[in-house]
A protein has these predicted regions:
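N-terminal glycine-rich anion-binding loops that anchor highly charged ligand groups
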Residues: 31-37
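Short, conserved charged micro-motifs
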Residues: 14-16, 50-57
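C-terminal structural segments of small proteins and small subunits
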Residues: 53-81
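Solvent-exposed beta-strand sheet faces enriched in polar/charged residues
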Residues: 6, 36, 45, 78-80
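Short glycine-/aliphatic-rich beta-strand segments at the starts of folded cytosolic domains
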Residues: 1-11, 40-43
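Non-catalytic surface loops within mature trypsin-like serine protease
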Residues: 9-11, 48, 81
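Short amphipathic alpha-helix segments
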Residues: 12-28
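Positively charged, solvent-exposed patches that mediate nucleic-acid binding
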Residues: 43, 47-49
């Protein structure tokens, strides 16, 4: 089963890369774009033989302990159907 882990900076953390992209977007004439935040995207495959609750726990732990810096980042897990 495939899980997508999306990691972003917490809203209270300054995102200098997002700010730079936002400035470029404005100077290039893209109307209505008011904010850009940069993040990371991970695809994680867990064996279908692993029980569903265990799969969720594995990916959650992986996201918390390996894929993110919990001080400045947050994450969301999306499971593929």
């Amino acid at each position: 089963m495939k899980a997508t882990v999306i990691v972003t900076l917490k809203p209270t953390v300054l995102d200098p890369q997002g700010i730079t992209i936002q400035r470029s977007v404005q100077s290039m004439g893209f109307p209505g774009v008011t904010d850009v935040r940069q993040g990371k995207y991970f695809e994680v495959n867990v064996s279908d033989n692993t029980p569903a609750e265990q799969r969720k726990g594995i990916v959650d732990r992986l996201a918390r302990e390996v894929l993110t810096n919990p001080v400045i980042e947050q994450y969301k897990v999306v499971w593929e159907q």
